[in-house]
């Protein structure tokens, strides 16, 4: 698979098969992803691979906090408002997701259960917790670099026939995850990457995706 094909075909997977991903395959992907660029070659990312009983424990804890109505206090502040054009895009993908599942807007129970499924990482058998050191002098640049390796990892996974979903809900309740990770007291949990084999027949993995026209985001200066 060439790079262009991987970029165009990769999508967020929201239903995974239960099959475990071989550890050596995950290791290969991570070994290649570490060649992602970073500012000054600092490579500030730190990645935890969570599987097996540890992942089961995390999913239970994560959903438990959601069910209890525990306030979300993520390490990295999440957006509270958007410019109107971004808000429209965010709302549109939410509508597409629910429509693919046949969940009506007024179906409170259906929406709640889908949220719980999301907090279980769509049943992915592997979670990669993407972190940076909180002692970094520039958190913003470290996060930029973390985004670079995250995208690289997702493209490499797609090339191997795997699916990914970059998930904020994996780090909404940091203690649910941090309690399972060694030496994580000085880490900022920025995002989770759900990893596994995609259920290619699931409607939620096949709805039409959209991207804004090039003219909306690119300005030529000559």
Briefly describe each language-model feature range:
Residues 1-222:
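Acidic, surface-exposed loops and disordered segments
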